[in-house]
Amino acid sequence: MLEARDITFGYPGAKPLYSGFSLQVEPGERVALQAPSGFGKTTLCRVLAGFERPQTGQVLVDGQPLPRRGVCPVQLIQQHPEQAVDPRLRMRKTLTEAGEVPQQLLDDLGIRDEWLQRYPHELSGGELQRFCIARALATRPRYLICDEVSTMLDAVTQAHIWHVLLDYVAQENAGMLLVSHTPALTARIATREVALA
């Protein structure tokens, strides 16, 4: 189980975004995090994936703190993929940062061989997001955090990406936390909703 236990987080000089917040995501569960814009959903996603540390409380997977080194069992896929890659690296290098990526996963995501030689700025947002998803799934995470992963993509690419993500969750019995401002998408994907605000 992925658990946020009584966490408090805020940026220096500002009041906490949340105080004493707790959340549990079970394996196989797809939880939608609901809150208005500006309430700290993206920040919470970063805390749960280990990119930020809470001032108080803990983030645990099966009762253990997130590892400080190595591959994290919680992988975050962000809304803006260009912020998740090194602009100086070709995509082949970016893709293999966390290890070998199975060819079947590249095929499932529609990643073309010629894209591997390109730099991030030479790809569209949808193409770049596919790389970020492949890199995350290649680590075989137990929990996926999907923060507005398909917001700025066309409908066909959105459907393709969600098909791959949901197949992974089903096959691996992985848990998912998702943030989306599209009620129809949330209703279709989530097994449960949690209000942050």
Per-region residue spans from a language model:
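Conserved ABC transporter NBD signature motif
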Residues: 57-70, 101
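Hydrophobic anchor residue at the start of the ABC signature
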Residues: 133, 145
